[in-house]
Amino acid sequence: MRGLYVHVPFCLSKCPYCDFYSERYSRALGERYKEAALRNLRFYNERFDTVYFGGGTPILLAREIVGILSEASLTAGAEATVEANPCVSDEERLFLLFSGGVNRISFGVQSMREEELRFLGRRHTAKQAENAILCAYKAGFRNISADLMIGLKNQTKASVSESVRALSSLPITHFSVYLLKIEENTPFFRDGVGVMNDDEAAELYLFTAEFLEKSGFCQYEISNFARTGYECRHNLKYWRCEEYLGIGPSAHSYYNGKRFCAARDLNAFLKEERQEITVTDEAAGDFEEFAMLRLRLTEGLSFADCARFGISAETLLRRSEKIPSEYLRVTESGISLTARGFLVSNALIGRLLGY
């Protein structure tokens, strides 16, 4: 069954490292956005088992999100996620979301150290992040995720472990860990902000992965860790090459065998009967794409899956012979990358694909 992604492109302010499409939040636009999203959704006679509201800062439109959910066709037990910034995650919004059908909340915490939060241009403090998480739990959420940013210049293992300890003492069930990357057309890029060198960043990534594992969060994807049973079902669709529909400015879709994206234009989305899309791949889902996505997961690539594409286990094993075991696991049923292998995944995947 397909998943639904809804891009909510509103923020109070733009973080200096972020290159996702967003516009300044205006309460007056909320109702218009909801109607545009529903208008587009009605073009598809679909039932979804996951829905993910990403942004932007979707929680700003809590009431509108509940309105969209009330009209969307979801299966019983569907996973419904909303991304949230701790500084606007008040009791009213969180209770409204949970009572309206949202059962998973993802907080953009990034760090529990004040100096790192200031550097990243975040509007919240560590205390606000803690309060937001506890408030979400009080509202009824039992599936709570936190984003963590690593690779900041001068960041240390001690500072990362401080953030992980602080967050894992709270009712968190999931972590997404991202290495800071300086993207073009961001203030960090224009200001020449530096990041850790590759070797330091790799060492910090491996440390963080190990520390999270010891704290009870199992790695299931390059950047994602979860307590047992709390993996993000929606995001697993991306990595398992399953189809999903994207609604909203800049939203991407994999639908009916094609990949396409919506225009990065809020005004057009609000005005037009149907969102403008650009097809990026007419025949998505070939073996190369499938393998690249599956090898992001610790479950890896099974020989049975390869056989569906006409790739034999013998071919894959032959290509993997010279890859050291510290980078690649080989079992009777398939292959997968280790945490160290994830750091050089592009090179390893290229070798496995026969490049």
Predicted regions and their residues:
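Short, flexible helix/strand-to-coil boundary loops that buttress conserved ligand/catalytic motifs
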Residues: 19, 121, 349
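C-terminal scaffold of the Radical SAM
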Residues: 1, 22-44, 49-311
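Immediate flanking context of iron-sulfur cluster ligation sites
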Residues: 1-8
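A short, conserved structural fragment
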Residues: 324-333
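Short amphipathic alpha-helical interaction segments
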Residues: 310-324
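Short, amphipathic alpha-helical interaction segments positioned at domain boundaries
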Residues: 340-355
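Minor-groove-contacting beta-hairpin "wing" of winged helix-turn-helix DNA-binding domains
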Residues: 334-338
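Local cysteine-cluster metal-coordination motifs and their immediate loop/turn environment
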Residues: 9-20
